Swiss-Prot record:
Domain of life, source organism: Bacteria
Keyword Chaperone tagged: no
Enzyme class: ligase
Gene3D superfamilies: Domain 2, N(10)-formyltetrahydrofolate synthetase, Formyltetrahydrofolate synthetase, domain 3, P-loop containing nucleotide triphosphate hydrolases
UniProt family annotation: Belongs to the formate--tetrahydrofolate ligase family.
Gene: fhs
Keyword set, alphabetical order: ATP-binding, Ligase, Nucleotide-binding, One-carbon metabolism
EC numbers: 6.3.4.3
Organism, as annotated: Shewanella baltica (strain OS155 / ATCC BAA-1091)
InterPro entries for the chain: Formate_THF_ligase (IPR000559), Formate_THF_ligase_CS (IPR020628), P-loop_NTPase (IPR027417)
Pathway in which this enzyme or protein is active: One-carbon metabolism; tetrahydrofolate interconversion
A GO biological process held by the record: tetrahydrofolate interconversion
Residues involved in ATP binding: 65-72
GO molecular function: ATP binding; formate-tetrahydrofolate ligase activity
Name this protein carries in UniProt: Formate--tetrahydrofolate ligase
Length: 585
């Protein structure tokens, strides 16, 4: 079979204006980037303000493994197949970060004959939204550092006289706004700034990957430009020496940060291999951020299409949980159905009986258990791994959403094992189960899945949140740990307990939680496979994101700046003699 790159390069593409017109966009509602991409103007929301909305489908997965489960392949394949059976469908997915592209995970345009094209344009830069987020974020970091420098140099009286600005009395030990870059670079996790003469007061800082920036979350959760401006104004950049918050509005930088992102708030329209529309917007990771594409993209698509297919990152304990408890809480748009992606490989890898070892990813294997051939038939491992799938089925169902299981078929899969899995799923709480061959067959490979999803979406969804706004932060943490992950409880570090008290006292206790934890286990420990039991979730730190409207709980050893592995993806990427990009996947 051709590589994803070859398939994308050989694809016959429509002009993006034709894709937009078929979706229902007017010419003046598209800001063109060549023939393959267009920004969608937010004026379309005003034109379609009274339009009946379509049905939202959320795609999630079992606990991820290094083999890949094919969640984006399924999202794109389902969208293509929905259009093929006469439903008007649009996909809404996140923009890939270049960190994973050059690291382990690779791109995020789908694969095979279920991908967004041109895939190289989507995976590298796209229309520059992530760069805009990086620039706006780092402007905030530069502004707080410069303000600290001048206030320290001049003192209160002279500073206010010369600058005609209020003295903020910044505590250099309480600067909360660090810098970001769209790469995996572990050496930037802990740095000192202001070194040397006349370079400002020294203080400890760090870099996060841009996908973890609060501005990325704001981009994903804003309803319009005015909402984004207000949210950026609420960003907490630092505390003063009295422990009071200093916001981007206080610093006077919120307007400029918004200006940098003025075009980034517009989703980017692309197409799939069969000409289905796809809106790509925002790129928060699901392990260290909330892991879903934008409310704005969903809103536009829902006013133009019968079905909108979106996805949450990683497993249902990660992106799907945050989709429900953060995104839906803010958008008010509940899904009509969910699709849960699994593979035979994933279930065997999650069995706990044997685990594949990948040198590119640290701490993913169970010690002292030898690896076996993941492709070989193994009924014992499959049955043991089904517990993980069944947990995720029940996890989705607890939100009151009908769930359809999609088995992403690989060429090496055993027919007997596939049949056993279908029967096991049909005996579970799932609405239905279908095999997807979208990777190999494109739109023809997920027709049955599309038909079952339509039937599921016709049932009456009884969506419910996991916890109410008014619950205390400690109660929300306990609910997420015990109900969301199956833990026996949660333990807060001394620092986290103090932060919970401080955040509550400052009036932020009503905000939902964004759990930053490993995606490689339902628990906080990546070595615990299957359905872990008898564990306690350790919360080491709580981080306020007042602009985005949630509080991040850092769990275990999760990092907000990834590192490159032993065999990074950039080793395969180059330019050929024709100037074409090769090795991207």
């Amino acid at each position: 079979m051709l590589t994803d790159m070859d398939i994308s390069s050989r694809a016959s593409l429509k002009n993006i204006t034709e894709i937009g017109a078929d979706l229902g966009l007017l010419p003046e509602e598209m800001m063109l980037f060549g023939h393959t991409k267009a920004k969608v103007e937010l004026s379309v929301l005003q034109r379609l303000a009274g339009q009946r909305k379509g049905k939202l489908i959320i795609v999630t997965a079992v606990t991820p493994t290094p083999h890949g489960e094919g969640k984006t392949v399924t999202s794109i394949g389902l969208t293509q197949s929905l259009n093929a059976i006469g439903q008007k469908a649009c996909a809404c997915i996140r923009q890939p970060s270049m960190g994973p592209v050059f690291g382990v995970k690779g791109g995020a345009a789908g694969g095979g004959y279920a991908q967004v094209v041109p895939m190289q344009e989507m995976n590298l830069h796209l229309t520059g939204d992530i760069h805009a987020v990086s620039s706006a974020h780092n402007l905030g970091a530069a502004a707080i550092a410069a303000r600290l420098f001048h206030e320290t140099r001049l003192g209160k009286t002279e500073f206010e006289a010369q600058s005609e600005q209020a003295f903020l009395d910044i505590d250099p030990n309480e600067i909360r706004w660090h810098r970001v870059v769209d790469h995996n670079d572990r050496c930037l996790r802990q740095i000192h700034v202001g070194l040397g003469d006349n370079n400002g007061p020294e203080y400890e800082s760090s870099f996060d990957i841009t996908a973890a920036s609060e501005l990325m979350a704001i981009l994903a959760l804003s309803h319009d430009l005015a909402d984004m401006r207000a949210r950026i104004g609420r960003l907490v950049l630092a505390l003063n020496t009295q422990g009071q918050v200093i916001t981007a509005e206080d610093l006077g930088v919120a307007g400029a940060m918004t200006a940098i992102m003025a075009d980034a708030i517009k989703p980017t329209l692309m197409q799939t291999l069969n000409g289905s529309p796809c809106l790509i917007h925002s790129g928060p990771f699901a392990n260290i951020a909330h892991g879903n594409s934008s409310i704005i993209a969903d809103d536009i698509a829902l006013r133009l299409a019968d079905f909108v297919v979106t996805e949450g990152g990683f497993g249902s304990d990660m992106g799907f949980e945050k989709f429900c408890n953060i995104k839906v809480r803010q958008s008010g748009q509940a899904p009509a159905a969910a699709v849960l992606v699994t593979t035979l490989k994933a279930l065997k890898a999650n069995s706990g009986l044997a685990t594949e070892v990948d040198s590119n990813v640290s701490n993913i294997h169970v010690p002292n258990i030898s690896a076996t051939n993941i492709n070989a038939p193994d009924q014992a491992r499959l049955e043991a791994g089904f517990a993980n799938l069944n947990w995720h089925i029940n996890n989705v169902a607890r939100y009151g959403i009908p769930v359809v299981v999609a088995i992403n078929r690989f060429a090496t899969d055993s027919d007997a094992e596939l049949q056993w899995l279908i029967e096991a799923v049909n005996a579970s709480a799932a609405f239905g189960c279908e095999i997807s061959d979208a990777f190999i067959q494109g739109e023809a490979g997920a027709i049955a899945l599309a038909q079952t999803v339509v039937r599921a979406a016709e049932t009456e969804s009884q969506f419910k949140l996991l916890y109410p706004d008014e619950a205390s932060l400690e109660a929300k943490l306990s609910t997420l740990a015990e109900v969301g992950y199956g833990a026996t409880g949660v333990s807060l570090s001394i620092e986290a307990k103090q932060q919970a008290q401080q955040l509550t006292a400052l009036g932020y206790g009503h905000l939902p939680l964004c759990m930053a934890k490993t995606p490689l286990s339902i628990s906080h420990d990546p070595s615990l496979k299957g359905v872990p039991k008898d564990f306690v979730v350790p919360v080491r730190e709580l981080v306020l994101h007042a602009g985005a409207g949630f509080i991040t709980a850092l769990v275990g050893n999760v990092m907000t700046m990834p590192g490159l592995g032993l065999k990074p993806g950039y080793l395969k990427i180059d330019i050929d003699a024709k100037g074409e990009i090769v090795g991207l996947g």
